[in-house]
Amino acid sequence: MKDKGKLVIWPAYIDQTRSRSNGRIISRKNAVKEPHLNEIKDAAKNLGLNPEVEPEKAYPKSWWEVSGRVLVDDRGPKSVIAKQISLEIRKKRGKGVPAKT
């Protein structure tokens, strides 16, 4: 990877419509439906993660779909950062944060 200190966040990581075997890395209750690159970028910016958007990239598992990716600062485990980004998108969409059980 050319950018040290960065994590790659693919939209598939937080997409509620995808299965774990197709790329989702967080739970369905914390994921969002069909996240867009701009939503991920805005959420990462709100979290202070210095996002860089690469719209021409394709997720390797579905190489025929050019979904793009977002590079963010590496400030912890990828799953934790993906969950924070997803919850930030949910807040912005007005869905709210899921209740803790």
From Swiss-Prot:
GO biological process: SRP-dependent cotranslational protein targeting to membrane, signal sequence recognition
SUPFAM superfamilies, A to Z: SRP19 (SSF69695)
The organism's place on the tree of life at top rank: Archaea
Subcellular location: Cytoplasm
The entry's keywords: Cytoplasm, Ribonucleoprotein, RNA-binding, Signal recognition particle
Family named by the database record: Belongs to the SRP19 family.
NCBIfam families: PRK00754.1
Identification of the protein by name: Signal recognition particle 19 kDa protein
Lineage of the species this protein comes from: Archaea, Methanobacteriati, Methanobacteriota, Stenosarchaea group, Methanomicrobia
